[in-house]
Amino acid sequence: MKRIFSVSVENRSGVLSKVSSLFARRGYNIESLTVGETHDPTISNMTIVSSGSPRDLEQIEKQLNKKLDVIKVRTFKEEESVSREVILVKIKYVAQNRSEIIEICQITKAEIVDTTDTNMILLLCDTPDRVDKFIDMVKKFNIVELDRTGTLAMKKCK
């Protein structure tokens, strides 16, 4: 079972290390992690995606709530959230492939953000599943470099 943890923490040095070590010490894998300052510069929000049994995920939530620097922990399932990832992919291409790459970008709403005669950098912001599918679509063009953010997520509006 996959769970998204949205953790508000004090925005200070060492907090990320403390939270990630909680997962490591207990043998839980962090599948995705993003951290950023909120509208309040004294608070950061960590979005952590992890999988495990319902008991394990409940234990993670309890342990997070015990941390001094943790202000609030919210958990939700993927279907209860709006989530996005950003990916930058540098691909090699030849002139004959250019129209196919442009078509893929139009279909997926990806952008071509940089180009030379032999390389292109593509940008996509979408759901994690669609980002995975996009990667599968562009693999055939010889991926030179790929950089992907972790999941950003918020609970859906009620």
What is the meaning of each model-derived region?
Residues 1-45, 49-158:
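Long, contiguous binding/interaction regions
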